[in-house]
Amino acid sequence: MTAEFIIRLILAAIACGAIGMERQMRGKGAGLRTHVLIGMGSALFMIVSKYGFADVLSLDHVGLDPSRIAAQVVTGVGFIGAGNILVRNQNIVGLTTAADIWVTAAIGMVIGSGMYELGIYGSVMTLLVLEVFHQLTFRLMNKNYHLQLTLVNGNTVSMLDWFKQQKIKTDLVSLQENEDHEVVAIDIQLHATTSIEDLLRLLKGMAGVKGVSIS
């Protein structure tokens, strides 16, 4: 029986670790180790809850609810998830990580109870949701524009650095240098909540910018 429990722990570590690896690759605070530990811990609690009191439950005068320990895992993991939810620049961040921690605990519990296939399917579906919906949201929430900037000579590098500081993705298409100015063609990617009109207005008011056009 012990060997079977060890197998459950290993499967929980693998299934939950895959989710943690995806989170870590995206630079999230809760990464591989956190998810592996949550998955293994949930599996252990489930094993104890299901099998740990077999000798006591066989006694006539003892009545226990073996599901109580497992139920507390759901409550306990909520505190871990809540620690990942932050307010940054008036935006709430960490909700997805908090949700996948909650799901990770559920996967660990499922595998700990012996439902291997359900746990693996749950892990695969979680990875699909995290990856597919990330790509889908990225495509729907971002717009591409082509800008042509006329700058005072020597300002191209500082302008590209400014875009980077604003977290605006840029691709340099061409750079044409003249005697008193340089013409830079770039492709930019803006979040849907950022107004291109506001960006153009801001660029036109910057020192070293002689002209801006969009196509």
Swiss-Prot record:
Topology class, membrane: Multi-pass membrane protein
UniProt key word Cell inner membrane: yes
UniProt keywords, alphabetically: Cell inner membrane, Cell membrane, Magnesium, Membrane, Transmembrane, Transmembrane helix, Transport
Pfam families: MgtC
Deleted gene: phenotype: Deletion of yhiD in addition to mgtA and corA leads to Mg(2+) auxotrophy.
TM spans (from-to): 1-21, 36-56, 67-87, 92-112, 118-138
Subcellular location(s) of the protein: Cell inner membrane
GO cellular-component term (any): plasma membrane
UniProt xrefs under InterPro entries: MgtC/SapB/SrpB/YhiD_fam (IPR003416), MgtC_SapB_SrpB_YhiD_N (IPR049177)
Described function: Could be involved in magnesium uptake.
Family designation: Belongs to the MgtC/SapB family.
The protein's name: Putative magnesium transporter YhiD
Species whose genome carries this gene: Escherichia coli (strain K12)
